[in-house]
Amino acid sequence: MKFMKTNDLREAYLKFFESKDHLRMDSFSLVPKNDKSLLLINAGMAPLKPYFTGLQEPPKRRITTCQKCIRTGDIENVGITSRHGTFFEMLGNFSFADYFKKEIIPWAWEFITEVLELPKDRLYVTIYLDDDEAYEYWTTLTDVDKTHIFRLGKEDNFWEHGAGPCGPCTEIHFNRSEEIPTNADEFVKLADEDKIIEFWNLVFTQFDGDGKGNYEKLANTNIDTGMGLERLATIMQEKNSIFEIDTLENILSEVAKLANVKYGENQKTDISLRLITDHIRSITFMISDDVMPSNEGRGYVLRRLLRRAARHGKTLGIKEAFLCNLCDTVIRDSSEAYPELNSKKEYIKKVIKIEEDKFRETLDSGMEILNGFISELKAKNEKVLSGVDGFKLYDTFGFPMELTKEILEDEGLSLDEDAFHEEMKVQRERARSARKVSNYMGTDVKTLDIIPAEVETVFDGYDNDTLNAEVKVLIEGEDFTDAITEGNKAIIVTDVTPLYAEMGGQIGDTGVIFNDGFKANVLDTKKNIGGKIVHFVEVVSGELKVGDTVTIEVDKVRRENIKKNHTATHLLDKALTEVLGSHVHQAGSYVSNDRLRFDFSHFEAMTEEEINKVEDLVNEAITSVTPVVTEVMDLQEAKNSGAIGIFDDKYADKVRVVSAGEYSKELCGGTHIDNTGKIGLFKIISESGIAAGTRRIEAVIGKEAYKIVNEKKDLLKEISTKLKCSEKELLAKLDQQVKELKEKDKEITALKSKFASMGIDDIVSSSRNVKDINVISYELKDVDSDTLRDVCEKVRDKAPNSIVLLMSANAGKVIICAMATKDAVAKGAHCGKLIKEISSMLGGGGGGRPDMAQAGGKMPEKIQEAIEESYKIVETLAK
């Protein structure tokens, strides 16, 4: 049988459908655009949903893609079986109201038998029970063996997802065995045994279902096919597992080399090898699409995958961080199809390294605590770890719940998941209440998304601030209307407009729409999901009807300020790359008339020196009075010219490139000034972190920037007046004041310690004898942790056969210290166990050794209650 490498298979498929007049599109980002139903793209058709639903016009009626996908529904099986994985590539060809069954069936057969040269005697086809049309085309337009066609039911060969577009499908299978099925039952049995594997699904979207079994024929039919690249490669390379195909085997071999083990010799190490091989692919591709590790959403998926892989690496005996280097193999083998991997290589490696190092630091500490929990459970002959303890591991050490579960399962134990989720409930409720729910693009009007496709709207405002236009659509509330009148808010859609619709971070223009008998203030301009430009207005006077001619005028002053801020944002982007490095990528922006905001990938807070350098570079570009030029060119020409852009966005064939001399060049559809000198002064007002690995800069320009400078100047003057020195002497004066304050602090701390030590005899005398152990539980007033530990040690040394528990409330928090003598430990005293329960009572956490432990809490009002409880706890611990 013909052998083909994975990368060659991908190219062969895409080329084949290009030859059938399909537009080859690059894979979309793993991060869905305008689709809140998905966390990550999980199917080839997922990014194309707006085309299938008719909300957006496809760039062509025929499209072919190889889409990167991630599915984590079966994550627990990854590594355990040889076929489960989280990352895969889905080959697909799609028709939007163009060709249908008659075309795709013979094309599919042509590709697999003539291009791939798969043996026909091993190919089988399934169709839906009553899809006679598909049967006819298979038997008349191909030479498939009729005895290899089986009719199956709805569960196998009918695609639907609730109400909406649906239809029958036909699946193509490959028989790996020597057994030949003679009927549908035998076929299904062999398929269930993985002797026959399905590798290509052709979905015929031809019905509109109501979700109750009733179907109407669609006016326009679509084709949606999907073929897993890795599964196809197992057939073409005659492998039994996806982990044996060329691209994955390269990764697996590298992991085995690092761990000094051989694949296939040990079931347990094989699981770890497969898991790491799969997960590093997902990790690499997710980061290349600017997903960052975090504790929520897709960032949590990434963190979970990375930490699972890191832990399994440690299980294999790999001592150092290794994932950041393992991704090199993924990038090398996949960058031809996904060039963004190469361009972001250092960025990907750095994100992985930081997260892996962070996890390795906490893993040892967390494992020590978890192993303690496991030992306690086994000693008590219990099988379930409490949700409280599981949540502490998550909250304190960043252990994902799933990781705790996996480690427990390895020991034959489990986690009380219900109780764990209860512990998280408060945090989730807080997050939920903070989350705002809105419809597409933040508006609450749904009707705007179903503006008829034949209504065309054009932006013609790069060189115009006033245009005459025809009113095409009017919307008031949730309804289309023929007319709008004074005093109402509405949406106006015109054939042309000079107003820029919010896009690419730039806010929408405002202005006025008027004619002789009508006037409305435009409050905002946006695009609906289909790209139609809509004006949100408040009617000032008169009446407007569909078909009327109006004049649209932009707010020129506001537009000019937006243009200045937008150009300044481009200069900032370039300056950040120069100062911080090539790993900097735009993660979001907000450009308004009075300020700008820029989110970017970076791993730590910027230093004052870096912020100053960035400011200086931007201001140098401004004072150089460089012309800002806009050119329209082919997308590939723009890329070749060095223009930067978020290439995950699907640009048109022709794109706008905005250049500020040789300094900055970006793909951008926004509005800009014609000269950098018009910006004036640029001033950064804040730099902060908004997510793991993502920073945010807020800045102002022109008058707003000068205002900031003057405010700081006035503040400096006021401070120097209060400190009775000149502005030049301020720093020396402050240094002197800080030095004096530190000396006073030392004196106060020494006095507190001395005062606390003076009462040691009183503390010792408070001892209670509990089962032949002297228990000393005491509250000290307003001392720091060093003083508390010092006093605790002195009390222990002065009180034989004792366990000492001291607590102090300081600035609304509780610090706790416990120490025990050797003879008390021998009798069952255990500081770590005591402090674990006490800190939990006080709303905190901690632990430690039998002879010494420390912790913190948040509820000083419960200290006295904790003191009384401590005697009971020691009583349960004493032998």
Swiss-Prot record:
Disulfide links within the chain: none
Enzyme Commission code(s) on record: 6.1.1.7
Compartments, as annotated in UniProt: Cytoplasm
SMART domains: tRNA_SAD (SM00863)
GO annotations of cellular component type: cytosol
MF-aspect GO terms: alanine-tRNA ligase activity; aminoacyl-tRNA deacylase activity; ATP binding; catalytic activity, acting on a protein; transferase activity; tRNA binding; zinc ion binding
PROSITE patterns to which the protein is assigned, alphabetical: AA_TRNA_LIGASE_II_ALA
Broad EC category: ligase
Residues that coordinate or bind Zn(2+): H566, H570, C668, H672
Sequence similarity: Belongs to the class-II aminoacyl-tRNA synthetase family.
Comment block on domains: Consists of three domains; the N-terminal catalytic domain, the editing domain and the C-terminal C-Ala domain. The editing domain removes incorrectly charged amino acids, while the C-Ala domain, along with tRNA(Ala), serves as a bridge to cooperatively bring together the editing and aminoacylation centers thus stimulating deacylation of misacylated tRNAs.
NCBIfam families, per database record: alaS
Protein name per the record: Alanine--tRNA ligase
